[in-house]
């Protein structure tokens, strides 16, 4: 395998304007077996050097190929440790000269003397052979969050993330950055996730647009069909809990009709809620549940695509309710599914998908699991139908209230019987709202011949593949052209290890066999 000697980069901690009188100049390098510039993963890991209880951390990337010099105190006990793992690489250990030091050495006097004379300290890595790709690295004081993903009719995968100059949700600046700007950035793949484009900003926030929907764009949800791509996003500078009829949080439509080459943006706030003639007139705050919109490419045999979205609405009484809305014109206009019926009350960020029999599934975030409800059409020609009663379920999710995704896919049983599988992703975590870790997919069989109740959907889930063993949170998924599942989610590490700010945004290509751990196969 090719070995490339690379340099440690990105010193995260401020080390002071002047070096200590006991500091000496040393050289750091990193060696990575199997890495080439064609590899989309560009962060290898992080290490920490500790001397006299003073820790200095560096992040390892291929951005600088020349040797770096660093001033550090070697007068006391010096220990070195591997402290930051990224997808795509395994840490091997440290070395000085021809001496391997292991993975967590304390330097001897001889080794410190070698370093003082210019012998490099080398951190060694190797590629792990996986196809996992980190699309956005959170190693900058501007944070990435909130995954959204869709596949167009040409097979192009489009992955979108918040790029948070504010380090926070829309309408907040608790970290005192002086900014409320959030951009939406995208990367695309035309070969089922093997390679990816460079990042593209599809909606750029502007701090000069105070009070306008143009100040920030975030919490995107996506749909695609043909060469059309629709993104619905929260917008502006009013945080969701603070919205009022006079000053609601904003909503934006961002769309492309040329497979993502160009994008248009328009405000949708008062089309969806607030106004007397809007979709939900008593709403004072709203946004679409992030991740994936559901698409029926040929609704009721009309030849037209119908897009379904799940929205969270805070009404004038400050109650949070979930609704499903639909659009037959790429999000330009929306209608509410089920009229005045409220599918889910007192819940949070919702997701939607279409069951094999045409029923519409609403899956909402709540503390302690998920809340499910089912809409059944009685007459598609008139868009008539009825919602079941909402049912809470916890077999398929973590104990904390965190966003997850729902998706229906094709599969084979072991006896080659064709089936449909319903997938639900969620962190397992723990009881705390912020104990977000161990993102996992649950699954269950669903049939084209069965009309389901909410209780049917809430029960009978099987835990599938656990995708992360560390801090991990929101997730989205869609079907790729090759039949695999494109899974896009938030995972450690993040800048400053503060997960209230951001995460790395990781893409995984998952087969049915992987998701179900061999119990079903792909068809």
Give the residues covered by each predicted segment.
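Conserved "repeat-terminator" motif of extracellular CCP/Sushi domains
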Residues: 22-30, 84, 104-129
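Positively charged n-region of N-terminal signal peptides that target proteins for export
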Residues: 1-4
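Tryptophan-paired
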Residues: 50-76
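Bacterial N-terminal signal peptides
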Residues: 7-16
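Asp-box/BNR beta-propeller blade signature and adjacent active/binding-site loops
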Residues: 128-523
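Short, ordered, surface-exposed loop/turn motifs in non-cytosolic proteins
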Residues: 34-60
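Surface-exposed interfaces of beta-sheet-rich extracellular modules
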Residues: 75-106
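Short coil/turn motif common to extracellular beta-sandwich-like domains
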Residues: 21-25, 73-79
């Amino acid at each position: 395998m090719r070995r490339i000697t690379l340099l440690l980069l990105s010193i995260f901690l401020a080390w002071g304007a002047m070096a200590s009188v006991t500091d000496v100049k040393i050289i750091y390098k990193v060696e990575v077996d199997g890495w080439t510039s064609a590899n989309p993963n560009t962060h290898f890991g992080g290490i920490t050097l500790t001397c006299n209880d003073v820790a200095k951390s560096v992040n390892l990337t291929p951005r600088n190929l020349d040797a770096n010099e660093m001033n550090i105190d070697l007068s006391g006990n010096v220990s070195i440790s591997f402290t930051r793992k990224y997808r795509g690489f395994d840490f091997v250990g440290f070395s000085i000269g021809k001496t391997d030091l292991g993975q967590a050495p304390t330097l001897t006097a001889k080794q410190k003397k070698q370093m003082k004379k210019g012998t490099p300290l080398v951190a060694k890595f190797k590629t792990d052979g996986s196809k996992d790709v980190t699309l956005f690295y959170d190693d900058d004081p501007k944070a990435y969050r909130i995954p959204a993903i869709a596949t167009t009719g040409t097979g192009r995968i489009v992955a979108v993330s918040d790029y948070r100059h504010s380090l926070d949700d829309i309408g907040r600046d608790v970290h005192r950055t002086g900014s409320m700007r959030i951009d939406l950035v995208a990367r695309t793949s035309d070969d089922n996730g093997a390679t990816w484009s460079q990042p593209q900003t599809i909606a750029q926030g502007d701090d000069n647009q105070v009070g306008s929907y143009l100040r920030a764009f975030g919490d995107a949800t996506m749909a695609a069909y043909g060469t059309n791509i629709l993104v619905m996003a929260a917008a502006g500078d009013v945080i969701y809990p603070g919205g009022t009829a006079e000053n609601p949080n904003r909503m934006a439509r961002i769309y492309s009709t040329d497979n993502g080459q160009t994008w248009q943006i328009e405000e949708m706030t008062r089309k969806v809620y607030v106004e007397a003639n809007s979709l939900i007139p008593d709403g004072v705050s709203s946004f679409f549940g992030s991740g994936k919109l559901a698409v029926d490419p040929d609704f009721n045999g009309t030849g037209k695509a119908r897009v379904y979205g799940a929205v969270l609405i805070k009404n004038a009484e400050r109650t949070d309710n979930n609704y499903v809305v639909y659009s037959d014109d790429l999000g330009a206009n929306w209608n509410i599914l089920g009229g005045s019926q409220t599918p889910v009350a007192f819940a949070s960020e919702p997701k939607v998908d279409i069951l094999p029999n045409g029923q519409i599934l609403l899956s909402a975030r709540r503390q302690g699991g998920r809340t499910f409800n089912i809409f059944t059409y009685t007459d598609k020609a008139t868009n008539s139908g009825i919602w079941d009663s909402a049912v809470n379920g916890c077999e398929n999710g973590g104990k904390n209230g965190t966003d997850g995704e729902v998706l229906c896919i094709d599969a084979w049983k072991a006896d080659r019987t064709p089936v449909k599988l319903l997938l639900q992703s969620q962190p397992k975590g723990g009881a705390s709202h912020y104990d977000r870790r161990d993102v996992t997919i649950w699954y269950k069989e669903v049939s084209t011949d069965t009309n389901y109740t909410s209780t049917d959907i809430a029960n009978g889930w099987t835990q599938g593949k656990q995708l992360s063993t560390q801090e991990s949170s929101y997730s989205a998924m869609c079907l790729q052209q090759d039949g695999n599942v494109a899974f896009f989610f938030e995972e450690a590490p993040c800048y400053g290890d503060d997960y209230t700010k951001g995460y790395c945004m990781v893409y995984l290509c998952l087969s049915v066999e992987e998701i179900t751990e061999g119990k079903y196969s792909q068809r």
